[in-house]
């Protein structure tokens, strides 16, 4: 690690001090990315900025020929996603999207099992991400302390419509659209990405959803509770995905369960079981055979998903960073290529469009845009 770039002088200093405390290294401090790239003393960057900035910051890195590890979501609008995708592909940099499930040992086992055909046709997927955290994405003390003069508000906004300085939208951006979609971009994109990975579909055919701010009425604009229903594929190979998430009660925690006619693949227990499979008494009546999966443990080594904001403490994130660093050295494709980032962006933006308009969202392959009510969705 040779330096830290941050437009807020406090975070810039704190970042450098943190690195020194951990490594003993005295690193450079850059006021912005242009200053960092002008010095040209770096080989790669880790982009951990506001959600809506990720794709644009990736473009900057790609144009400077720097390898990238970028946090998810990749983009919150299709225009940004397209820019990021094209920049990475043109530059041929090593790219890793921060979807750390793609480096989890149990997720690789699940992917291999489904693709082997032993699981059978996926007929339904249920996903949850529940916490009880009124403090999640809140930074009230820092909101009181930060001053506009100590950062660069115009640079922060990048391509979003200009509005006057807001310390909450700067620091608590995950609660405010169009700086973040909130739950879809922060959590859902992790889980829906596994659907694309395991099944080979690039994006949903349609998404409907609703939600609201039902409890934490603290001025936020993004929902504290939401449910979305995804339709994938067609009449021959299609299935439904049900996703729900709430900030208001943690029962159920994080769940990802794949269903076939023969049972379930549960990524919370890391087991395949015949739970819910077709039993003989019902099958025989229709001249069919019983269909019950053999029990199967995905992996002896569990890669556990966590609900803490500090994702650096889980082994999936460590494995994912290691995979990126290895690929930077050997110039091979990472576990989280830019196509995966682009595809989870499509699903995320479709969900945001459905939630914010109350309409069914679809995707136009020809123009690569999310459509609601016959119009392209942006903000």
Walk through the language-model features, giving the residues of each.
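Solvent-exposed loop/turn segments at secondary-structure junctions
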Residues: 7-11, 51-53, 75-77, 101-104, ...
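Rossmann-fold dehydrogenase core element
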Residues: 83-101, 110, 120-125
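Extracytoplasmic/secreted proteins, especially bacterial periplasmic and envelope-associated proteins
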Residues: 10-14, 32, 53-60, 79-83, ...
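N-terminal glycine-/serine-/threonine-rich beta1-alpha1-beta2 phosphate-ribose binding loop
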Residues: 1-70, 82-94
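Short loop/turn motifs at secondary-structure junctions
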Residues: 25-26, 41, 118-121, 200-203
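Contiguous beta-strand/loop segments that form the cofactor/metal-binding neighborhood of enzyme cores
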Residues: 108-109, 121, 126-130, 135-339, ...
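General small-molecule cofactor/ligand-binding pocket signal
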Residues: 2, 28-30, 96, 208, ...
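Short strand-turn motif at the edge of the Rossmann-like AdoMet-binding core
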Residues: 72-74, 98-101, 129, 338
């Amino acid at each position: 690690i040779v330096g830290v770039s941050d437009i807020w002088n406090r975070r810039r200093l704190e970042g450098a001090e943190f690195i020194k405390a951990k490594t003993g290294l005295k690193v450079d401090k850059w006021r912005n990315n242009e200053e960092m790239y002008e010095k040209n003393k770096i080989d790669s960057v880790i982009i951990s900025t506001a959600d809506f900035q990720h794709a644009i910051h990736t473009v900057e890195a790609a144009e400077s020929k720097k390898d990238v590890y970028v946090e998810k979501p990749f983009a919150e609008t299709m225009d940004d996603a397209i820019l990021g995708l094209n920049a990475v592909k043109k530059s041929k940099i090593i790219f890793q999207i921060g979807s750390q499930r793609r480096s989890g040992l149990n997720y690789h086992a699940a992917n291999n099992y489904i693709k082997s055909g032993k699981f059978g046709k996926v007929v339904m997927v249920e996903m949850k991400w529940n916490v009880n955290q009124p403090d999640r994405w809140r930074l009230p003390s820092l909101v009181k302390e930060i001053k506009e003069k100590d950062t660069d508000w115009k640079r922060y906004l990048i391509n979003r419509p200009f509005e006057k300085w807001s310390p909450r939208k700067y620091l608590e951006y995950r609660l405010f659209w169009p700086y973040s979609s909130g739950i879809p971009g922060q959590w859902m994109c992790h889980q829906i990405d596994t659907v694309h990975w395991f099944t080979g579909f690039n994006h949903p055919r349609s998404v409907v959803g609703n939600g609201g701010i039902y409890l934490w009425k603290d001025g936020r604009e993004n929902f504290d509770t939401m449910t979305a229903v995804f339709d994938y594929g067609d009449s021959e190979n299609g299935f439904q995905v049900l996703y729900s998430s709430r900030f208001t009660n943690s029962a159920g925690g994080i769940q990802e369960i794949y269903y076939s006619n023969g049972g379930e693949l549960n990524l919370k227990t890391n087991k395949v079981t015949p739970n819910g499979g077709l039993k003989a008494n019902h099958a025989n009546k229709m001249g069919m055979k019983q269909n019950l999966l053999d029990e199967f443990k995905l992996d002896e080594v569990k890669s556990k998903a966590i609900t803490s904001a500090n994702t650096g403490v889980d082994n999936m994130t460590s494995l994912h960073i290691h995979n990126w660093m290895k690929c930077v050295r050997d110039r091979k494709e990472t576990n989280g290529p830019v196509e995966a980032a682009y595809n989870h962006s499509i699903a995320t933006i479709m969900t945001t469009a459905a939630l914010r308009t109350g309409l069914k969202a679809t995707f136009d392959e020809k123009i690569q845009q999310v459509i609601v009510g016959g119009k392209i969705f942006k903000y």
